[in-house]
Amino acid sequence: MAMKAVCVLKGDGPVQGVIHFEQKASGEPVVVSGQITGLTEGEHGFHVHQYGDNTQGCTTAGPHFNPHSKKHGGPADEERHVGDLGNVAAGKDGVANVSIEDRVISLSGEHSIIGRTMVVHEKQDDLGKGGNEESTKTGNAGSRLACGVIGIAQ
């Protein structure tokens, strides 16, 4: 049975968006789609963070969702956090149209992202290849521009 989730991204600045998640069945890939506006042109890190706690903005969402204690990586890497979805690209108009298919995240079970926080970052994620310690944790993606808790949708 298909499962769906949604996330409304908001931050302190102009960045906002709505992201949809759909998984046809357990074990199938999750299709991530939506739009984020108010970004600067270029690539922005896009990750699922550990907690669904936005009580103090995006900072209380904790680190990337990483149940297997792996190093940060890109979406196609074997060594990656479950929440590592790479980058979204914004055009000159500041709009990023999101279209990602990921086989590691899930909407149920051990890798479920339901109740966790989706975050879009200030800078490009270097996918763990930046050559420093921060790269292996966050991809040097910088501050958290907007976030929202991922919830079950109909």
Curated annotation (Swiss-Prot):
Binding-site positions, Zn(2+): 64, 72, 81, 84
InterPro entries registered for this protein in UniProt: SOD-like_Cu/Zn_dom_sf (IPR036423), SOD_Cu/Zn_/chaperone (IPR024134), SOD_Cu/Zn_BS (IPR018152), SOD_Cu_Zn_dom (IPR001424)
GO cellular component: axon cytoplasm; cytoplasm; cytoplasmic vesicle; cytosol; dendrite cytoplasm; dense core granule; extracellular region; extracellular space
Entry's EC annotation: 1.15.1.1
Binding site for Cu cation: 47, 49, 64, 121
Major subcellular location class: cytoplasm
Enzyme class at the top of the EC tree: oxidoreductase
Pfam families to which the protein is assigned, alphabetical: Sod_Cu
Modification type Phosphoserine: residues: 99, 106, 108
Single GO BP term: locomotory behavior
Family: Belongs to the Cu-Zn superoxide dismutase family.
Annotated protein name in UniProt: Superoxide dismutase [Cu-Zn]
Organism: Rattus norvegicus (Rat)
Upper classification of the organism: Eukaryota, Metazoa, Chordata, Craniata, Vertebrata
